[in-house]
């Protein structure tokens, strides 16, 4: 099953159809919406009859996939790699593994004073779509190959 098949994605929001309310850890939703410092995008629950969806407001954000289309300065590359580490902090805080996607089209950025800040989306049962370890490796590689400084890029690739 492809993860993107269960999402409606546009420039302003992402909508994820949930199979059952039991799939959602309501404590995690509360934590996401109350703790802005975690780097998670706010979630709204939309219910229409038996259909339940999670709505993520992504207006004003850029996907990491789009961000990596341009070469990265050394400073922005380090900032992004630090942002990615934040993902593991989020998972340990929510006490739930596999709850954020490390795919580049599900990580969002907002630049503040020319520094990129990463924001993740909480997705129940993310692990049914992929292995975060594989996606983490792909993500690191995507950031590294976008670095414009050849020496730094080559050094990072040799690690």
Tell where the protein language model's regions lie, with residue ranges:
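Conserved structural core of kinase catalytic domains
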Residues: 2-80
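Flexible, charged surface loops at secondary-structure boundaries
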Residues: 8-10, 93-96
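Ordered hydrophobic segments in well-structured contexts
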Residues: 13-15, 53-55, 101, 108, ...
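Short amphipathic alpha-helical segments
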Residues: 75-83, 132-136
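Elongated alpha-helical scaffolds
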Residues: 78-82, 103, 109, 116
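Short C-lobe core helix of eukaryotic-like protein kinase catalytic domains
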Residues: 81-95
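Conserved catalytic-loop position in the HRD/HxD motif
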Residues: 94-106, 110-111
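C-lobe/activation-segment region of protein kinase-like
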Residues: 107-159
């Amino acid at each position: 099953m492809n993860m993107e098949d269960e999402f409606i994605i546009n420039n302003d929001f992402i909508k994820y159809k949930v199979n059952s309310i039991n799939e959602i850890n309501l404590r995690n939703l509360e934590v996401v919406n109350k703790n802005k410092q975690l780097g998670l995008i706010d979630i709204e629950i939309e219910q229409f009859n038996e259909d339940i969806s999670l709505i993520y407001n992504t207006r004003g954000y850029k996907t990491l996939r789009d961000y990596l289309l341009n070469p990265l300065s050394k400073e922005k590359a380090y900032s992004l790699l630090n942002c990615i580490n934040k993902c593991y902090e989020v998972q340990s805080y929510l006490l739930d593994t596999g709850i954020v996607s490390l795919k580049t089209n599900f990580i969002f950025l907002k630049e503040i004073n020319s520094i990129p800040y990463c924001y993740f989306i909480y997705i129940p049962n993310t692990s049914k779509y992929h292995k975060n370890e594989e996606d983490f490796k792909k993500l690191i590689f995507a950031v590294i190959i976008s670095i414009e400084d050849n020496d730094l890029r080559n050094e990072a690739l040799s690690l």
